[in-house]
């Protein structure tokens, strides 16, 4: 065919011709692609075949191993006497509520086969028994925590009891405070008691007559009611009554009433009344003295306070006057600096302020 005739050929026919030529003479790229596809297909088939062969080999080895084990067991059964030991142990707990049993199987070697080694014991357990430690773990941890808590609690209680046993404070501040308070209170009480308080002791004779016992009891009760009165709340003076088993003691001036033979409270009512009146008078006089002494103390204290206040006020006024005079001068200096000129008398007194003019200073030095 001529090349000019090809234009008259339809397009479908031209494509068919090209495809035929391509199949007869393929290009380099097409051949490469074909080879790559073929290699992939071959590799996939090879890998699948290899997997199959491996799986078959494994199965064959397993079967052979099982056969060998069965054969060996059959030999051992012929030579060994089977002895079965079953040991069942059941354990139950309240917290988890389970029971387990385990059985141990042993094979004892017979005397007729000394060369065969003893097989290892095979232990078979139930699944519930394997779960038991997991159930016991929280209980054991709870027990440990409870034990540690009890230990710490006991230690804390011991420390608290030891602190309670200690009566005195650890620091010496409390001791010093009590010591100082006892000194000041003791000194004040002794001064007041030496000036004011007098002790009156009265007794009831044990061997007195039956008629005088009633009078003695009434006298002692009356003396209690009289002597228990306090003159005033500001003075805070206490009156004490002591009962001795021998005599009635009042003061040094009342020695004429001390009868050694306990005949003070006789059957005579006049003596009893006279004693009662003297006691009342003595108590009243002492109360008056206490009141007067307290008033004098208050007056003296007030006077001292007034004098101190007046002196302080006067000192303040003098200081204010001196400050006003010193501030009025224009030029000020201390006259202690004039000691070199010959004014030594100003050293003995407080510093005096004057002017700084030399003429006035010369006149002062003359």
Swiss-Prot record:
Entry's Gene Ontology cellular component terms: plasma membrane
Compartments (UniProt record): Cell membrane
Biased composition (Basic and acidic residues): 56-73
Swiss-Prot/TrEMBL keywords: Auxin signaling pathway, Cell membrane, Membrane, Transport
Annotated spans, Disordered: 42-73, 129-148
Keyword Cytoplasm: no
TM segment ranges: none
InterPro entries for this protein: BG1-like
GO biological process, one term: auxin-activated signaling pathway
Job of this protein: Involved in auxin transport. Regulator of the auxin signaling pathway.
Family the UniProt entry places it in: Belongs to the BIG GRAIN 1 (BG1) plant protein family.
Protein name listed in UniProt: Protein BIG GRAIN 1-like B
UniProt organism field: Arabidopsis thaliana (Mouse-ear cress)
